[in-house]
Structures are given as C-alpha cells and as structure tokens.
Amino acid sequence: MILANDELKRLISTGRLKVDPLYPDTVRENGLDLRIGGEYAIYAYESTVVRPCDLETAKPLFRIVKSDEVVIPPRNFVLLTTEEYVKMPDDVVGFANLRSTLARYGLVIPPTIVDAGFEGNITIEVVNESPNTIVLKRGMRFLHLVLAKAEGRAQYSGLYQGQRGVTPPKGLKGEC
C-alpha cells in the first residue's frame, strides 16, 4: 500500500520517519521530494577496465566534486546524494524515482529501493542519455521517493547504513 501525504506527515510527526532537513514542499501527494546535496561523484578515469569482483572498494575510481552545480556530460553518469538525511521506519520501503521533468531532459535512474530501516543520505545513480551536457543545481528537487507499507518488520544492516554524503559503490570482492 502506497502511503499518501497524510500518513507521511503522521509518520514524520511521530518520529518514525525522519527527513532532515524537512522543507515545506518535501511531502507530496504520494511521496517525498528530495533535493540534490552539495557534492557528487563522477568517474575519475575513462576507458578503464572495472572488475567489481576484484575490488574491496571502488572509491579510487571516482572523483568527488563539491559544488553548487552538477555537470553531467552527454551519455555519462554521476552519483548524486540527497541533501536530506533520511531514516526509514522498519516497516516502510521506498521506491526512488527521478522527477518527471528531469526525465524529459534525458536523465534516467535505475530502479532503486530504499530498504525498510535504512538510515542515511541517499546516493543515486543519474544517467544522462541525451546528446547534451546537463547542469543541475544544488538544492533542487530531483528525487521522488514513494513509500509503501511492508508486511512485517525488517532490520536493515546493509553496507550503506548511516552513509553521509555521496558514497561510491563498495567492491564486490568476496561476493563473486
């Protein structure tokens, strides 16, 4: 069951759902609009062979950029972080979607789940499928997080729990 704005406001007012900072336009009809944070990550090198199964961390592959603008070259991608630090209830799951207006410029994100019990800034992959460089601004609403009630409760203990700022991928060494 997708949660409407009255239920989202109730979860926030009781402290079960935390969004910090919380803006007047964050809670929407059927989800939360989240803003671009002050840093992003882009690949530091081009034409490099990347073997996730051999990596303990992918952090050296990325360059962290602190800026009020996010520059996404044509047919390239960046990792964005939300300005907001989010703490999900243990019985609510989030489905991250790019705001439709940005998709109409040629930006896309992969299907992304924010697990029940997750806490942290949300790092999201944004791909520019257009032939043009797209420049986004810090603080603009870019991500729409639809929240749904889960049956039962989950205890999240993933690798990205508590992350702050943009977080490059972890390596998959030991999983392959």
UniProtKB/Swiss-Prot annotation:
Q: In which pathway does it act?
A: Pyrimidine metabolism; dUMP biosynthesis; dUMP from dCTP (dUTP route): step 1/2
InterPro entries in UniProt: dCTP_deaminase, dUTPase-like_sf, dUTPase_trimeric
Q: What class of enzyme is it?
A: hydrolase
**E.C. no:** 3.5.4.13
Q: What CDD domains does the database record attribute to this sequence?
A: trimeric_dUTPase
Which Gene Ontology molecular function entries are recorded, alphabetically?
A: dCTP deaminase activity; nucleotide binding
Identify the catalytic residues. E125 (proton donor/acceptor)
Q: Which domain of life, per UniProt?
A: Archaea
KW Hydrolase (keyword) present = yes
Biological process terms from the Gene Ontology for this record are:
dUMP biosynthetic process; dUTP biosynthetic process
Tell me yes or no: is Ribonucleoprotein among this UniProt entry's keywords.
no
Give the catalytic activity.
Answer: dCTP + H2O + H(+) = dUTP + NH4(+)
Self-association or partners: how does it assemble? Homotrimer.
The free-text function statement in the UniProt record for this protein reads:
Catalyzes the deamination of dCTP to dUTP.
Q: What is this protein called?
A: dCTP deaminase
Task: Supply the source organism for this entry.
Answer: Pyrobaculum arsenaticum (strain DSM 13514 / JCM 11321 / PZ6)
